[in-house]
Amino acid sequence: MMDNQSKPSIIPSYEWYERSINRVEDSSSSINNVSSKLVFFFIIGEMKDLKIPQNTRLLLSTKHYILPMIHLEDKQKETINFPSKKVRIIFGYFNNSNKEGEITLFLDTELEKSHNLNITNKHINNDQPLKGLSKNFNSLSLLLQSLQRNYNASLLTFDKSTNTTIKQLPPPLPQPQPQPHQQQPHNKKQIDDIELKKKKEIEEIDEIEDFESTQPLVVDEVDDNYDDIDNNNNNNNNSNNDDDKLEDIEEHNEEEEDQIHLFTHAHSLTQKPQLPKKQQQSFDEFQRKIKDNKSPQKLKLQQQQQQQQQQKQSKHFDAFEEELLEQQKIHEHKLQQQQQIKPQKQQLQQPQQQPQQQPQQQPQQQPQQQPQQQPQQQQKQQQKQQPTPKKIINSLQLNNVNNNNNNNNNNNNNNNNNNNNNNKNKKEIMPGWLEKAILSNSFPLNPCGQIVSLPEDSHKKKNISLYLSDNICYIQIIVSENTVREALENKKNVFNFGFLFGCVIEILDYTIKPDQDFSKFVLNINKFVILNKNKHSPISPTPISKHPRVISLLRIKKDMNKNASNNIGNNIIYSESLISSDQLEILNSLELWNLPTQITKQLSLQDLTEGNLSMLDSTNDGSSQEYEEEEEEEKNQKNFEKEEEGENIQMRQLYEKYREEHQSQVKKQQIIQKLKQQQQQQQQQQQEKEKQQQEKQQDEEMSDFENIQNLMEEVQKSDDNNNNNDNNNNNNNNQTSKRKRLNEFESDPDDIYDLLESNTFAGHQVKGVDENKKLRVDSEDQQTKKLTTTTTTTTTTTNTNNNNNNNNSGIDSGTKTIEDDNQLDEDFFDGLNYSIIASSGGSNNNNNNDQNDSITTKEKERSETIKTHNEDEKKNSLSFIKFENPIPSNNPITTTVTTTSASPKITEIPKQPYAIKPSISSYSIRPTLPTKPSLIKSLNNNNNNNNNNNINNINNIGNKNTTVNNSNHSNHSNNNINNNNIFKNSNPIVDTNFSSTTKTDEAQQSKIFTGNQLPKSPINNENVVNNNNNNEINNTTTTTTNNNSGIHKNNNNYNSDNSDNSDDGLKQEKEEQKEEQKENKNNNNNNNNNNNNNNNNNNNNNNNEVLNFSFSLTSSSGTNVKKTIPILLADYSCTSVIQEGGFEIIVKRKENK
């Protein structure tokens, strides 16, 4: 750290500001490709004191401490105030090629007091371009050097010869006075002196550039140079004390030896120029003075002065940078100490040969000096062969006591470098390797810094200091303008600094402060949480643009400008992103997967922007064990690297295979999608063809209507055969039973809700159809005319009350489709009411020869009359309910539903509907949701119905169905089989593959009531049923029964048509009705008893929140019927789906948490 006394105390003045601009613009190197000019200086304080304007873009970096740029126009003045005590000056240049007004700002110096700087048009409207800058930033080091030399800036520069970071502090200039335009030269001598100084500076800069251009671009030798410096530094420390004893012996030969070693050093430079910049300058001066025949004693004095200056500068070197270098050197030294002992001994013997060869090349040296020089070097070599101490001292802090030792060390340095480079075949990647490679190759990619290390008990401290340096690793924080503003105002969890730690953390409170000499920032984290701990694991090679440890925003400059032109004030542009495509290819070729600390999963740009960093599996609480694990992993790092070198080839192969597989999968998916689209198109074409065929059939049916009517009239007159009479009686019995079933449902449509809400059919719930909402079927013939080769069965709950029969005279039936029993899951559907609208389709698999006999003249007549009665409904389909004008209100939901039906062509009339498997094209529940649905928190005991009652009722129904079917004629044996199959064990066959014409595949795959996977109902235990259905459900029958309790008087057409041949059938129906009414009364009593016994058990379930859906249904006859469906909100969620003709309520069961 720099002491307060040694820090430059510069008070900025207007003249200093002007002078700095002029000196930068007067630099020698000029580039025509860039039209950039210096604009102004910024004075910056701490981050908390920084206020960012709204229309600015932030540029972040550590090598260039960059401020938000301010867009300035002509005749505009901007005053920037930073109240912090610690401030620094930054200057920038304006790039005219970038139309957004991008301003890159560089750190200049540190100030002790705050300062207000006025920016005027004089500084903006500068026609001369800024010299020393180029697109690829090759002359950026020149710019920084000029700042250091002219403005006494405390900047870090990278010495390419030794690959070390050096703090160069030239002698400070006299402090400018605070008032502007006071120091102005009046005499011509002063002006001439100033011009001479400028010329000298320009010459020195040109020499440095020429020397830098001749340097080779070496990446693999970075770590070797560090090791060699460390070894030589240790040797110097051991040999200093012994060298002091030899000073008297060497005094008379010092001058000649200085010349020898300098020439040997020059000879090594011709082979591989890696001298520091100061030594290169001294060597150039030495060559000039030799040509002028100057004495070597003056050269010695000049060299001593330069060494003293270097020692002073090394004192001011940043302590933090020293610690970093020491850690790196210690780590490298431990790994290579044993391997380099033998090569070092061989290398130390080589300097004996060079001094012998040098005097022959130099005519100035005398042959008498050679035998004296040899024993001195032998003694020094013996001293250097002693074991080196573990502690390594920085080469910049060494006190060079003797020039002979320094020269010998230089020779040893060069020899060691050559031998080590020849002996070492493997590249070891250490912290900071990428930065060294980038800087040694003059890459414009500047690091943003990373955390150095954390002590073991650092998490126990309240404040953890994390140092960001420019020679460790990378950290990229992608933020927006709003997040920066929030961070500066609130200091809350805005950024996620997980990249710093090698693990994912969340910083809750932090502050960022610059160090005393502004060479680094200190990130003080007050609160943080370790979300995840990362462990070392090899990962596949990835390009630098996608690697999580390296900057992710690597764009070409052209692309960056195009993107930034549309997003002024919102984007954040980094100076690191200005990289060419060629340099990007070089970076991609580096082995980035061998970094010391790694993140197992790659982070995309979206993850960085959104902060989605919780992608790893294991979690951590920030205990000290984590840091112990890190130390153990660092010990095993050498073994890791060796293993990874062998695995890299395999990993590359695996990576290529993975890419090929991924590409093949993508192609397969594309092919599959195309095939699906083709199939869908074919299906649509087939459907269109079927519709056209149906329309043609309807037209043919209408043309043949008159012929059929004439035939039926003739058949009515022919009653000669007794067989026809028997068939008529049998058919009448079946038809009356069918009418009776339909009319039973017509008697009270509420019963189907009660039956479906309960846990009926011994644990199986039938997905029933409330056809009251949609269909009107007056007779079997009308129904069979509507459905082609199909009939639908009903699952209804009926009541023998006269009130229900009178009120529901306009509603005829509800239908339910039946298909395979295999498709029915247990707990199929519980407690929710819904409707299924069946469309035409299907086939009769159980047709008998008796079916032709079942078609009587009366049936044909009735089918004719039904056709004429429903001519308006022929062209409509059964695919959806037409929804008209929903009325939202605070009252229960009311909707008006109009029904439509179709009358496709009939090929033959099936004898038994249960043998049919109709195809379902759509279903829907389409009530209107109110804006504020009414919730019923409690229900009375009368509103509850026991599950056991429903089960008992259905069991009784199953028994009645079997007995009644057995009482039918023997020629209907197939009907008995079908009935037994359907109601055996109270398991009806139900079509569960319902699909809607408007629904998508995603809806069918979800947990909507569209398939086999239907949710379980809480009503098994809750038993929430509407109170209107409490008594009505007690007298129930199901399909396939000959129950006559629901016959209406509206079937006069049917009775009148059968007046000749169906009198006996009506008598039988009345008798059967009386018997069934008796059985229903008995069942009523049993059910009432069960209700009384179980009502007490239902008291605990009365407080469930229930959403009541109310429907207002309109049948084809114009009768309105209201119905309410209760749904438990605690277990179900209701949503609506807009569809053609209305919308649909989708009820989903909530998952148990």
From Swiss-Prot:
Comp. bias regions, Basic and acidic residues: 687-699, 772-784, 856-874, 1064-1081
InterPro entries xref list: Pfs2-like
Region (Disordered): 164-193, 224-245, 294-316, 332-427, 613-648, 683-703, 717-740, 772-819, 838-874, 942-1106
Biased segments, Pro residues type: 169-179
Low complexity bias spans: 231-240, 298-312, 336-391, 399-423, 721-734, 788-808, 839-854, 942-987, 1019-1059, 1082-1105
Gene Ontology terms, MF aspect: transcription coactivator activity
GO biological process: mRNA 3'-end processing; positive regulation of transcription by RNA polymerase II
Bias kind Polar residues: ranges: 613-625, 988-998, 1005-1015
Any one Gene Ontology cellular component term annotated for this protein: mediator complex
Name of the molecule in the record: Putative uncharacterized protein DDB_G0290989
